[in-house]
Amino acid sequence: MEDDRATACVRVDGAPAEATLGGGELRWRRAAGERALSLEREVLGVQARGKEVVVRAFVAAGAARVTSCAAAGAGAGGKGAGRRRCRRDFVLEMADGEGAAVEWAERLTRCLGSFGRPKRLFIFVNPFGGKKCAKKIYDAEIKPLFDAAGVSVTVQETEYQGHAREVASSLDFAKYDGIVCVSGDGVLVEVVNGILQRTDWEEAIKMPIGVVPAGTGNGMAKSLLHSANETCSISNSIFAIIKGHKQSLDVCTLSQGEKKFFSVLLMTWGLVADIDIESEKYRWMGSARFDFYVCTELFPFLSSSFFLAVLSSIISAVIRIMNLRKYFG
């Protein structure tokens, strides 16, 4: 991170204070105690407004990171990590006027820019997933956070199944720093399949993909937020995206004849669906048709062959994930 240290006399909530910038933190000290914000872990963006510097933050609910010398370390990475967060603006009134406010805003912006955060995002919003409220969630919770962070967005509402895959397969990735899926796990899978079907897939797969839990199944978002030591919520997922938090994932490839499908979460054999469809001719039997079909027609002639390749070193990890109760919480 760029070392852009500075000190200034300010007023916070009407009280005089000394503000310091350095070591990746913004601190201000006054009679009531000291307060600090981690630029990387807690600050969304900064704005100069007259002689004021408005620091847009996303802090652990209930407190800023430091309220007194004894409380130091209770924020990101300390006891506050993993708690729910909330939006809050901190206003520093510069004693030296508007020029100082502009200078400090520029310093803070340079520091934030050194973290490699995304500036341009392409966002898929699935209006049909979950409770069908993804668009409302985007307008009420997601857009305000991106606006506060100064992130430019292009929004695409999906109109039918497979739409996200089609768009991802031809999207001009040079225009964006990442893709965000406001949906459940389905749109994420579509985007991955669209990317891996491109002729330039080896380069395109490097594009970061963010996931916001707004669908029926949100296993991937929960898993990624858990690894980032954050509570699973829409706002926390957006903040992780704004911060540029990344984690590499394995991709599973399923080939059946000339068909190829890619998965990043799970893959199952649709046995139950087969039984439901094929036992339709025994509907007159009621619910007993399922058992009857399995015993008389499926098991006697069941013959399936497949080749499974897996690294032995990850088998134990897979078993742990499958047995993690909170994984699908």
Model-inferred region functions:
Residues 126, 185, 213-215:
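Active-site glycine-centered loops adjacent to acidic/histidine catalytic or metal-binding residues
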Residues 158-160, 166, 173, 189-329:
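Catalytic core of DAGKc-family lipid kinases
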